[in-house]
Amino acid sequence: IYIEEYKPLAIWQFRKEIIILDRDGYHIERIQNKDSHNNLLLVYGDEADLNLSEFIDALENFPSIRKRIGHVTFIGKRRWDLHFKEGVKIQLPMGNTYDVLLELDQHLKDYNLIEKGHKKIDLRIKGEISTDRIFKSNQ
């Protein structure tokens, strides 16, 4: 007999269901209340469960970003939005999640965007960051 234990990593809220996921998006169990699992990453969006692994692999390299995340949303079955606990929405482009998070991490340090009160950061155009003004990256 072989027993495999799945390690809970995220809570996926989709439509009216709340499901605990492992890092590969495997549905561990349905739950009624997400509040009892507030240590897990909260995830929204159609097919977020199928795309979680690549996102988590990248995010694990950026603990300073991870600790700020209140929840993430998979948009249009192709890209992620990060929602920070401070009320900031960060729009990521499709693909290359690691590179984009590296760029975001650097921008947050260089420009102090959160501390300056920016509530929306758009990284969907490569080499640019826009909030209420546009910043050109050095890439």
Ranges and model annotations:
Residues I1-Q139:
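Charged, solvent-exposed interaction patches on well-folded alpha/beta domains
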